[in-house]
Amino acid sequence: MKPLSLKGHDRALTRVRINRDGDLLFSAGKDKSPCVWYMENGERIGTYDGHNGVIWDIDVSWDTRHFCSASGDVFVKLWNCETGDVINSVSTPTAARSISLSYSGNLIAFTTIKMTQNVASLFVYDIRDGSQMSGENQPTFRKSLQTQANSCVWTHLDDTVCVGNEKGNVHQYDIRKGDDIVNFNDEAHKFQINDMQMSTDESFLITASKDKTARLFDARTLDCLKTYKAERPVNSAAISPIRDHVILGGGEEAMKVTQTTAASGHFEAKLYHLVFEEEFARFKGHFGPINTLAFHPGGNCVVSGGEDGYVRIQEFDTDYLKFDYDF
C-alpha cells in the first residue's frame, strides 16, 4: 500500500501517538507545536500552541479527552484534546524529557533532566487535584534519579511506573509505596534506553536502545524474555496489538549521517517475529533515522516519525495480514 507522508513539522520528530479509538494521530517534534491529524486521510486538524521550546514527548488519554506534553521550556502542559486549550501548566525544575498518562487517564508521570544543581527526577501528578497542578501542593510522587531517564511508561494500571535511563537500566517504582524501587534490571542494555512501550494487554514491555538492540521484558518482573538485534542504534520499538510481531526503527545517528550513504544508514523500519527474534520485513521511506514508531490499535498500519521532519502512515497490505510464519 502507498504510505501517506505528512509534513507538519519544521524539525525532527520526537514522538507519534495514536489514540485508543485509532482515528486520531498526534505528533510532536523539536519545533514548539504538537499536531493532531486524521488517521484516515492524513489531514491535519490543528496544532496545540503554547510551548516555547522543543517538545520531547506527548501522550493522550484513553478517552481522547486529555493530551499532555513534556517540553524543554520547563513546562509540562495538560490540554483539552478537542479545543486545544491549555487546562494546566506544571512548572518543572529542568526540561521534561518523557511523559506518560496512566491507564485511567488521571495520573501523569514525567521525568526531568539533570542540570546544574537540579538532579534528574521522576514526578507523578494527579490531574484531578487543582492545587497539585497549580504548584501549591506537592506532587503525588517524587523521586530523585541517579541517572537521567529519557523514557517512562505506566506498567501496571495506575500503580507502577517504569523508567529507562542513560546507563541502560530499567527501574520500576510503585507510587503507593514511597520512593523505593520495586523492581529493577541493571543489565537491560549496555547503552542508553531511547524508548519504552507497553503491549496492549500490559503484560510486556519493549525497550529500544543505542546498543543496537530492542528487548522484550515481562512488565511485572522485568525479566528479559527476548532480544532483537539490529545493525544500527534503535530509537523506537513497538509491539503489534494483533500479531506476534514487533517493529524497530532507528538508523545511524543524525550527526553521523553525512558520512554514510542512505543504504548503510539503515533508515528502514524493521519487522521482527516476537517469539523467534527474526527479521522478516522492512519499510523504506525516511531519509534520516526513525525517531519514533507507533502501531495502530487495529494492528493494520504503523506510523513512524523521522529526523527528516516527516510522519509516515504505512498501511499493511493483505499479504502481511495473511502472512503466517513457518515453524
From Swiss-Prot:
Domain of life (superkingdom): Eukaryota
Main location: cytoplasm
Gene Ontology terms, MF aspect: RNA binding; translation initiation factor activity
Key words of the record: Cytoplasm, Initiation factor, Protein biosynthesis, Repeat, WD repeat
Protein's GO biological process: formation of cytoplasmic translation initiation complex
Taxonomic path: Eukaryota, Metazoa, Ecdysozoa, Nematoda, Chromadorea
WD-type repeats, residues: 8-49, 51-91, 144-183, 188-227, 229-268, 285-324
Protein name: Eukaryotic translation initiation factor 3 subunit I
UniProt subcellular location: Cytoplasm
GO CC term, one of those recorded: eukaryotic translation initiation factor 3 complex, eIF3m
Described function: Component of the eukaryotic translation initiation factor 3 (eIF-3) complex, which is involved in protein synthesis of a specialized repertoire of mRNAs and, together with other initiation factors, stimulates binding of mRNA and methionyl-tRNAi to the 40S ribosome. The eIF-3 complex specifically targets and initiates translation of a subset of mRNAs involved in cell proliferation.
Pfam families linked: EIF3I
Quaternary structure note: Component of the eukaryotic translation initiation factor 3 (eIF-3) complex.
Similarity remark: Belongs to the eIF-3 subunit I family.
Organism of derivation: Brugia malayi (Filarial nematode worm)
